[in-house]
C-alpha cells in the first residue's frame, strides 16, 4: 500500500472518530514515505489536538512529528506555532523553545509570530530587559503586524518597559527556593 493510500485511510479514520486507527495509518504513511509532511502533521495533531492536554509521552511524540514537518517545509508557520506551544505549554522546554523560534525567524524572516513568542518566553522567565529588546525589534524591523494584534503588542511593550525599569530583585523568581514571593504565596 502506498504512503498516499495510508494517508487517505488516516483521514477517513479520523473523520469517523477512530483516532487510534487514524494514527496507525498516518504512521504507516510516514514509514512508506518519510517525507510525507501532511502525514507527519496529522500525527502531530492526532497526538496533541488543539484544546486538549496531551500527556508527556504524547506531547514528546507530537513534537518529534512537528519537527519533521518544519524540517520538510520550513514555511509552515502553523507547525512552528504548534511545536513552540508543545515545548512551552506541555514540556516546559523554554530555552529550547527560544531556539525553536529563532529557527522559525530564520526560515520566515518576515513573520512577527516568532518575535512575539520569544518575547513571551523571555517575559515568563523574568528576563524583562531582554523581552523588551526582542519586542522592540518587531518595530525596528518593520514587520507586518495584524491590526488585531497591534493593541496587544503595544500593551505588552509598555508593560515590558515598566518591568525592565524596575529593580530586578523585586521580581518573583519561582525557581529560587528562598525567593520572597514564596512567602507571599504561603500567606494566602
Which residues make up each language-model segment?
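Canonical tetratricopeptide repeat
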Residues: 8, 42, 82, 117, ...
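Short coil/turn linking the two alpha-helices of tandem helical-hairpin repeats
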Residues: 11, 44, 49-56, 84, ...
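Structural signature of tandem alpha-helical TPR/SEL1-like repeats
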Residues: 15-25, 51-68, 91-103, 126-134
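A conserved position within tetratricopeptide repeats
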Residues: 30, 67-70, 88, 105, ...
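Eukaryotic alpha-helical solenoid repeat scaffolds
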Residues: 123-188
Amino acid at each position: 500500500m502506498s504512503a498516499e493510500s495510508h494517508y487517505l485511510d488516516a483521514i477517513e479514520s479520523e473523520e469517523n472518530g477512530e483516532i487510534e486507527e487514524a494514527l496507525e495509518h498516518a504512521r504507516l504513511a510516514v514509514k512508506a514515505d518519510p517525507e510525507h509532511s501532511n502525514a507527519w502533521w496529522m500525527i502531530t495533531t492526532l497526538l496533541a489536538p488543539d484544546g486538549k492536554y496531551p500527556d508527556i509521552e504524547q506531547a514528546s511524540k507530537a513534537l518529534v512529528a512537528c519537527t519533521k514537518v518544519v524540517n520538510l517545509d520550513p514555511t509552515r508557520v502553523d507547525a512552528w506555532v504548534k511545536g513552540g506551544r508543545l515545548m512551552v505549554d506541555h514540556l516546559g522546554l523554554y530555552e529550547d523553545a527560544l531556539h525553536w523560534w529563532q529557527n522559525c525567524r530564520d526560515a520566515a524572516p518576515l513573520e512577527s509570530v516568532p518575535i512575539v513568542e520569544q518575547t513571551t518566553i523571555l517575559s515568563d522567565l523574568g528576563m524583562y530587559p531582554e523581552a523588551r529588546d526582542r519586542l522592540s525589534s518587531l518595530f525596528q524591523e518593520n514587520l507586518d503586524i495584524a491590526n488585531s494584534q497591534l493593541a496587544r503588542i503595544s500593551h505588552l511593550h509598555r508593560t515590558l518597559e515598566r518591568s525592565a525599569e524596575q529593580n530586578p530583585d523585586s521580581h518573583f523568581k519561582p525557581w529560587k527556593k528562598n525567593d520572597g514571593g514564596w512567602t507571599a504565596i504561603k500567606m494566602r
